[in-house]
């Protein structure tokens, strides 16, 4: 596969080779691979997938931010709520910014890139920045839950959420540096024979393959492998700490832990597996073929869309499952629509049991004060 054929650029929505044919760089005399059918399918699939993820992520994450804002208004200090809530706030912002880039790339697939070179660079960098930030914030949430439940870290330390703000700032800075690859290399490219402009990463011809493979490796390590290892380690120990619990809500938390890991793996593992296959093909470990080219082109974009859907699922997995989060959402609804307009939501917020049931917090030895207001364990 040539350097631009595969939809596997590291830190941007799928960069696809819009040529109608693809040639093997190692054998220039080989018959070209036809990409017409692949292009037609992706041109129909990508806009629908991007817009659907955009709408769902927009609604879910705005709800999360509104509920957090309502809660913060009742506090006076920027360090007034738990570490997990701080990470959840930054996760929602990151997912919202990521979703905001998708309509631009949907328009590109429908027609062409019409927003100019500057927006091409900014949009690509913003996408890259928030993909990295999102998965790293997920790792931070799991680590904070691990400290609270398994080790019951000192309450006074964990309530100083300014520590979490510093950690979040560090993550933003690191990911901003990684996104500069897009800012530097993204450019407008004209599709031969189609008179259309697209926004793609364009590496220097001499080092194109090295850059692609190197950045794919960085992306897989920071964007999937490292967060997955952190989540597996933390949630495995949380699972062990709660596996002997008898309370119904603790058993419910065990099911939630399993769901969090499974959803993350299903969302991102297929995409990273296909990108690894593409890297091996570029290195010559896997023999190139037209059939494999088409599988990678279609598969990477489809699985990328599956991964992007995770930013729409995060509000459900990390926010709405918390009893107290749902109650705050119900109160916000009552304030906006009145008590009669939110009867169903109030019942849902109180759970299946009695509406007068006392809310429980995190399942640690410091249950009351160590609770995350929007914790997945609440």
Swiss-Prot record:
Disruption phenotype: Viable with no significant effect on survival. Macrophage and neutrophil counts are normal. Macrophage migration in response to cxcr3.2-independent stimuli is not affected, although the basal migration rate is reduced. Macrophage migration to sites of bacterial infection by S.typhimurium or M.marinum is reduced. Dissemination of bacterial infection to distant sites and granuloma formation is also reduced. Receptor for the C-X-C chemokines cxcl11.1 and cxcl11.6. Promotes macrophage chemotaxis to sites of bacterial infection. The chain crosses the membrane at residues 48-68, 87-107, 122-142, 165-185, 213-233, 254-274, 305-325. This is C-X-C chemokine receptor type 3-2. Its main location: membrane. One of its GO terms (biological process) is leukocyte migration involved in immune response. Glycans are attached at residues 3, 19. Belongs to the G-protein coupled receptor 1 family. Disulfide bonds join 120-199. One of its GO terms (molecular function) is C-C chemokine receptor activity. GO terms for cellular component: external side of plasma membrane. PANTHER family: C-X-C CHEMOKINE RECEPTOR TYPE 3-2, CELL ADHESION MOLECULE. It is found in: Cell membrane. Residues 1-47, 108-121, 186-212, 275-304 are extracellular. It holds the Pfam family 7tm_1. Keywords: Cell membrane, Chemotaxis, Disulfide bond, G-protein coupled receptor, Glycoprotein, Immunity, Innate immunity, Membrane, Receptor, Transducer, Transmembrane, Transmembrane helix. It comes from Danio rerio (Zebrafish). Residues 69-86, 143-164, 234-253, 326-378 are cytoplasmic. It is a multi-pass membrane protein.
């Amino acid at each position: 596969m040539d350097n631009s054929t595969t939809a596997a650029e590291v830190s941007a929505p799928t960069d696809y080779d819009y040529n109608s044919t693809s040639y093997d760089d190692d054998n220039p005399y080989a018959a070209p691979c036809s990409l017409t059918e692949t292009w037609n399918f992706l041109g129909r699939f990508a806009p629908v997938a991007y817009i659907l993820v955009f709408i769902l992520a927009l609604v879910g994450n705005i709800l999360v931010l509104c509920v957090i804002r309502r809660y913060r208004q009742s506090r006076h200090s920027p360090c007034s709520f738990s570490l997990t809530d701080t990470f959840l706030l930054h996760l929602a912002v990151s997912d919202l910014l990521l979703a905001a880039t998708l309509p631009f790339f949907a328009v590109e697939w429908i027609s062409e890139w019409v927003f100019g070179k500057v927006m091409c660079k900014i949009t690509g960098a913003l996408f890259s920045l928030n993909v990295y930030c999102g998965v790293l914030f997920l790792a931070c949430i799991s680590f904070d839950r691990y400290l609270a439940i398994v080790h019951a870290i000192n309450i006074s330390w964990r309530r100083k959420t300014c520590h979490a703000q510093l950690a979040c700032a560090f993550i933003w800075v690191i990911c901003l540096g990684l996104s500069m690859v897009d800012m530097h290399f993204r450019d407008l490219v004209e599709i031969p024979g189609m008179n259309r402009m697209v926004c793609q990463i364009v590496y220097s011809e001499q080092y194109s393959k090295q850059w692609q493979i190197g950045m794919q490796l960085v992306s897989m390590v920071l964007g999937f492998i490292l967060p997955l290892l952190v989540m597996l380690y933390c949630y495995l120990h949380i699972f062990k700490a709660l596996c002997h619990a008898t309370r119904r809500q603790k058993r419910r938390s065990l099911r939630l832990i399993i769901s969090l890991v499974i959803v993350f793996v299903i969302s991102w593992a297929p995409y990273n597996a296909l990108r690894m296959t593409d890297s091996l093909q570029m290195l010559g470990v896997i023999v190139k073929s037209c059939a494999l080219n088409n599988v990678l082109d279609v598969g990477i974009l489809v699985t990328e869309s599956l991964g992007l859907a995770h930013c729409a699922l995060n509000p459900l997995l990390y926010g709405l499952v918390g009893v107290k989060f749902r109650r705050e959402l119900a109160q916000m609804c009552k304030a906006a629509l009145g008590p009669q307009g939110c009867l169903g939501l109030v019942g849902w917020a109180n759970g299946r049991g009695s509406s007068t049931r006392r809310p429980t917090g995190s399942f640690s030895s410091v249950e009351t004060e160590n609770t995350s207001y929007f914790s997945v364990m609440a």
